[in-house]
């Protein structure tokens, strides 16, 4: 248990401010914030390897949007979501109203009602994925500000 306490101490002693912040580009984060993320990952790994529950959620959805093919990332996101107690729902743009002109704002708010996190993998074209994810983040912020969403889900660049 000392190992776990070490991770928690490291997290508490960082000068990281990650609450309600998305990590879309790692180079936009401070070294302290990245250290905090790595310590959180180590703490979760410790708990899992010692058969201690890591469920943070009783229920909730983790939405995944993959705009290009992926195996490792898709299953890593699903496993991490499950580890925290979330059910994964894949968003297939071809089977949604996105294909018929629904805006990013409409889609982002619609899929966010019971979602805790939205994971997006979009790296087919340099810079385009980050621009899309930033637009989704702005739409979520606006949805929360206008009272459309009770809470804003986290946004993760996969």
What are these regions (language model features)?
Residues 1-75:
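Positively charged, low-complexity intrinsically disordered leader regions
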Residues 55-158:
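Phosphate/diphosphate ligand-binding glycine-rich loop within oxidoreductases
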């Amino acid at each position: 248990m000392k190992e776990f306490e070490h991770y928690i101490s490291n997290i508490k002693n960082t000068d990281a401010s990650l609450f309600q912040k998305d990590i879309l580009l790692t180079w936009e984060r401070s070294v302290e914030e990245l250290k905090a993320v790595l310590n959180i990952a180590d703490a979760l790994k410790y708990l899992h390897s010692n058969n201690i529950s890591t469920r943070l959620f009783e229920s909730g959805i983790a939405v995944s949007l993959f705009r290009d093919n992926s195996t490792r990332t898709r299953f890593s996101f699903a496993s991490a979501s499950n580890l925290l107690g979330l059910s994964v729902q894949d968003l297939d743009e071809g089977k949604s109203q996105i294909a018929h002109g629904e805006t990013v704002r409409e889609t982002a708010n619609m899929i966010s009602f019971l979602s805790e996190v939205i994971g997006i993998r979009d790296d087919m074209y340099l810079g385009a994925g980050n621009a899309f994810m930033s637009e989704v983040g702005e739409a979520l912020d606006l949805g929360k500000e206008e009272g459309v969403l009770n809470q804003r889900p986290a946004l993760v660049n996969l």
